[in-house]
């Protein structure tokens, strides 16, 4: 279920301040964040975020296709190793 249009997108205040500072200074430094719940706004296009996945920070370069999605969608938290192979030789 998506968020109500009248509420608008959610962006953590501390993350918004970091984005504003980065845009004012024109620096392309990586913005480190734990805020996986924040929406990606159009002003974030072209910036790189280091999004925490619970263990380490995953670099995420924001493109136009990502606008409207959450930052956490682009840093997976679970690793899938696949199912074990069939053990036909053991029969």
UniProtKB/Swiss-Prot annotation:
The keyword ATP-binding does not apply. Keywords: Ribonucleoprotein, Ribosomal protein, RNA-binding, rRNA-binding. GO terms for molecular function: rRNA binding; structural constituent of ribosome. SUPFAM superfamilies: Ribosomal protein S19. Gene3D superfamilies: 30s Ribosomal Protein S19, Chain A. Pfam families: Ribosomal_S19 (PF00203). One of its GO terms (biological process) is ribosomal small subunit assembly. GO terms for cellular component: cytoplasm; small ribosomal subunit. NCBIfam families: rpsS_bact. Protein S19 forms a complex with S13 that binds strongly to the 16S ribosomal RNA. Belongs to the universal ribosomal protein uS19 family. This is Small ribosomal subunit protein uS19. It comes from Desulfotalea psychrophila (strain LSv54 / DSM 12343). The gene is rpsS.
């Amino acid at each position: 279920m998506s968020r109500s249009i009248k509420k608008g997108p959610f962006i953590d205040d501390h993350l918004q301040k970091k984005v504003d500072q980065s845009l004012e200074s024109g620096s392309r430094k990586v913005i480190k964040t734990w805020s996986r719940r924040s929406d990606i706004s159009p002003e974030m296009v072209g910036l790189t975020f280091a999004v925490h996945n619970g263990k380490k920070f995953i670099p995420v370069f924001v493109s136009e296709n990502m606008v409207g999605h959450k930052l956490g969608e682009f840093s997976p938290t679970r690793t899938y190793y696949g199912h074990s192979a069939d053990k036909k030789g053991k029969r």
